[in-house]
Amino acid sequence: MSKVSGGGPCSRRRDGVDPALRSRARRRALQAVYAWQISGGVAKQVIAHFAHEQAYEVADLVYFEDLVEGVLTHCAELDEKLTPYLDRTIEEVDAIERAVLRLGAYELLYRQDVPYRVVINEAIMTAKRFGSKYGHTYVNGVLDRAALALRKVEVLG
């Protein structure tokens, strides 16, 4: 019997993407981005540390590396894109929610292969799991408005 989640053949989409593995990659990417935000470490070291741990947890390692490298490389741009939808400065946003928002903004901008609804839903679920009690509602509001600006055709289409 095939596994329905976590890497079984039945869980893959037609394009070969396994949503469960991508979700795990996002959770690990959140941890890596959070660690980078707190420590200010070098991007390659953060990725190497978490990629090593990633090998022990079944996940989409390529997607994990793309997310982390993308957020760390484009952080200033992502913050700029998020700023109009924040009610405070990005630095004042809780560190977990800040990492989730940056990951979501990266996917909205640079991962057009991922539907905006998937980006927002994954961000909400990640914020619920790791963030503050109501952090997921904040993440939802910010990314929902950002998606309208960044992917207007897809959102309104």
Curated annotation (Swiss-Prot):
Check the record and name the InterPro entries matching this protein.
NusB-like_sf, NusB_fam, NusB_RsmB_TIM44
Can you tell which superkingdom this protein's organism belongs to?
Bacteria
Is this entry keyworded Transcription?
A: yes
- A UniProt-annotated Pfam family: NusB
Q: Which GO terms describe its molecular function?
A: RNA binding
The similarity comment for this entry is: Belongs to the NusB family.
Q: What name is this protein filed under?
A: Transcription antitermination protein NusB
Organism of derivation:
Xylella fastidiosa (strain Temecula1 / ATCC 700964)
Encoding gene (name): nusB
